[in-house]
Amino acid sequence: MPFACYFFIFINVGLGEGSALPVGVPVPWPSATPPTGWLKCNGAAFSAEEYPELAKAYPTNKLPDLRGEFIRGWDDGRGIDTGRSILSIQGYATEDHAHGLPSRSTIVTDATINFYFDEIWVNSGTDIIKRGNTNDAGLPAPDYGTFKTYKQSVDGLGAAASETRPRNIAFNYIVRAA
């Protein structure tokens, strides 16, 4: 986007001197370079003498590092995300969940079901033969039918990645410094 377009946005949304936005409020910005009087939220330290109003919002004199991060509303007693404080960082997590595995087992308690991974048990008609991984680590052989290899992965489904994330668009978070 040409500079004139950024300047137009800067003037028309009140990002300049006398802005209605308070000092320290993170704002998504569609450029790598913040406008004059604004700083990137990149974890950098700043001078409280140079930016006294910013130091009131960030008393550690360090901006939050919002590069590659999502902002989440503070729980403030709601009970959705308990134990957090303002400006605290929360790491990656995937919600605990379970997947059912098909089984012909007659055992009814989850605690006693054995699953065999990376191996296949084949009923030859006269015997049950283990194929694939032959290191059974002391697990007993099943006394029925065929076990299939189970793999818990989304790789190859078009959405596999090294993290869990919603769809998103990248912006540069900036704060008004003075």
From Swiss-Prot:
UniProt cross-references to Pfam families, sorted A to Z: Collar
Highest taxon of source: Bacteria
Protein keywords: Repeat
PANTHER family recorded: PROPHAGE SIDE TAIL FIBER PROTEIN HOMOLOG STFQ-RELATED
Family: Belongs to the tail fiber family.
Protein's recorded name: Putative uncharacterized protein StfE
